[in-house]
């Protein structure tokens, strides 16, 4: 919005051209989302407490979690508001990639909101029925996937980028839609599974978003894309603004979500953030990079799949409890230790992922 306004004001005073610079807009996008999130936090927490919208804790979970019962949840609303407002202010709104991410953020946020509402307001422990949750996730993902395919059909925007092989970039055709669908839905649910401890999901989300901000900048720059042997995608650079908004909103939320948490993001936050990261990865043609940088989300998801599969096939559990962060809690690790170690691993994986862009 401000980009469009600045273009017209620059005719009167050239100083307004600063609003067209990507680096400037990336910084102020981060700061805007951070300030909005920090400002909304106390008001959101107080409002949720008045409405008695508190976390539901399972009796079969770790005993240390019983003290979390009643902690305000659905705080992901403030994350989404901060991101969306910041992006609408600082991004070029004529860019279709920006709208693809915003659609997933809003759509998955709505699905998560209904799920949380049923759990904490209607006291329905199951929340939104699983098949309906998956149905709406699928509808939104397919709408966005087909839209992205229509935008980038038969261009580098629909090629598959394989790590370590600079000359292996097959054109996917309609398989692009299927891949986009699985990445968006899968990442959304992976972040949701990870969101089980104070600050555990939000910091890896911030790290991955920061990593993708760098990738988006390189992908949208013809010279750097050529240097790194990744596809040059014309619309990609504007995703930097989206990524930095996620970073800012995430850091602002962490202020209140760090141990011991004053508020939880709930499904409204985790489903939306995961879906956004998946969408960004698809738009940048970096699905494999997402697997590396988002390795914490991948391991959390695999631990659940392995646990359920092992119990159904052998009648035995691999872990004391899944997702795997609960396994370490039950081994006696204090919650802050689990959280910080997962953060460190996440940061390492993001750096390794970025390094793979050069190892080709």
Curated annotation (Swiss-Prot):
For this UniProt record, give its keywords in alphabetical order, as a comma-separated list. Answer: Cell cycle, Cell division, Cell inner membrane, Cell membrane, Cell shape, Cell wall biogenesis/degradation, Magnesium, Membrane, Metal-binding, Peptidoglycan synthesis, Transferase, Transmembrane, Transmembrane helix
What does UniProt give as GO cellular component?
plasma membrane
User: What's a single GO MF annotation on this record?
Assistant: metal ion binding
Question: Does Cell wall biogenesis/degradation count among this protein's keywords?
Answer: yes
Bilayer topology: Multi-pass membrane protein
Where it mainly occurs, coarsely classed, is membrane
Q: Which cofactors does this protein require?
A: Mg(2+)
Coiled coil residues, start to end = none
Subcellular localization is given as: Cell inner membrane
Catalytic reaction list: UDP-N-acetyl-alpha-D-muramoyl-L-alanyl-gamma-D-glutamyl-meso-2,6-diaminopimeloyl-D-alanyl-D-alanine + di-trans,octa-cis-undecaprenyl phosphate = di-trans,octa-cis-undecaprenyl diphospho-N-acetyl-alpha-D-muramoyl-L-alanyl-D-glutamyl-meso-2,6-diaminopimeloyl-D-alanyl-D-alanine + UMP
Q: Which PROSITE patterns match?
A: MRAY_1, MRAY_2
Q: Which PANTHER family match?
A: PHOSPHO-N-ACETYLMURAMOYL-PENTAPEPTIDE-TRANSFERASE, PHOSPHO-N-ACETYLMURAMOYL-PENTAPEPTIDE-TRANSFERASE HOMOLOG
**Family, similarity comment:** Belongs to the glycosyltransferase 4 family. MraY subfamily.
Q: Which NCBIfam families match?
A: mraY
* Functional note: Catalyzes the initial step of the lipid cycle reactions in the biosynthesis of the cell wall peptidoglycan: transfers peptidoglycan precursor phospho-MurNAc-pentapeptide from UDP-MurNAc-pentapeptide onto the lipid carrier undecaprenyl phosphate, yielding undecaprenyl-pyrophosphoryl-MurNAc-pentapeptide, known as lipid I.
The name of this protein is: Phospho-N-acetylmuramoyl-pentapeptide-transferase
The organism of origin for this protein? Pectobacterium carotovorum subsp. carotovorum (strain PC1)
């Amino acid at each position: 919005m401000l980009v469009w306004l600045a273009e017209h004001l620059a005719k009167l005073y050239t100083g307004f051209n600063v609003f067209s610079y990507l680096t400037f807009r990336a910084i102020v996008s981060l700061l805007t989302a951070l300030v909005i999130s920090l400002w909304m936090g106390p008001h959101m927490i107080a409002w949720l407490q008045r409405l008695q919208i508190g976390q539901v804790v399972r009796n079969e979970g770790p005993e240390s979690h019983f003290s979390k019962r009643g902690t305000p949840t659905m705080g992901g609303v403030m994350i989404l508001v901060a991101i969306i407002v910041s992006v609408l202010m600082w991004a070029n709104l004529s860019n279709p990639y920006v709208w693809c991410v915003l659609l997933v953020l809003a759509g998955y946020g709505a699905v998560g909101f209904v799920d949380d509402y049923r759990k904490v307001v209607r006291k329905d422990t199951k929340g939104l029925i699983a098949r309906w949750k998956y149905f709406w996730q699928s509808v939104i993902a397919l709408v966005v996937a087909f839209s992205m395919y229509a935008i980038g059909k038969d261009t580098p925007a629909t090629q598959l980028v394989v790590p370590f092989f600079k000359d292996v970039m097959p054109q996917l055709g309609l398989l692009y839609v299927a891949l986009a669908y699985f990445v968006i839905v899968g990442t959304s649910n992976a972040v949701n599974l990870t969101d089980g401890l104070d600050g555990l999901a939000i910091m890896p989300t911030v790290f991955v978003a920061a990593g993708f901000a760098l990738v988006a900048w390189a992908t949208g720059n013809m010279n750097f894309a050529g240097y790194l042997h990744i596809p040059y995608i014309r619309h990609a650079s504007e995703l930097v603004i989206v990524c930095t908004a996620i970073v800012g909103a995430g850091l602002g939320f962490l202020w209140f979500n760090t141990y011991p948490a004053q508020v939880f993001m709930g499904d409204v936050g985790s489903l939306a953030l995961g879906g956004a990261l998946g969408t960004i990865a698809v738009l940048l043609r970096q699905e494999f990079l997402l697997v590396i940088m988002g390795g914490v989300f991948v391991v959390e998801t695999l631990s659940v799949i392995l646990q359920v599969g092992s119990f159904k096939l052998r009648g035995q559990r691999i872990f004391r409890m899944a997702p795997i962060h609960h396994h370490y809690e039950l081994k006696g690790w204090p919650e802050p230790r689990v959280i910080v170690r997962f953060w460190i691993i996440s940061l390492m994986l993001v750096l390794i992922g970025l390094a793979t862009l050069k190892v080709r």
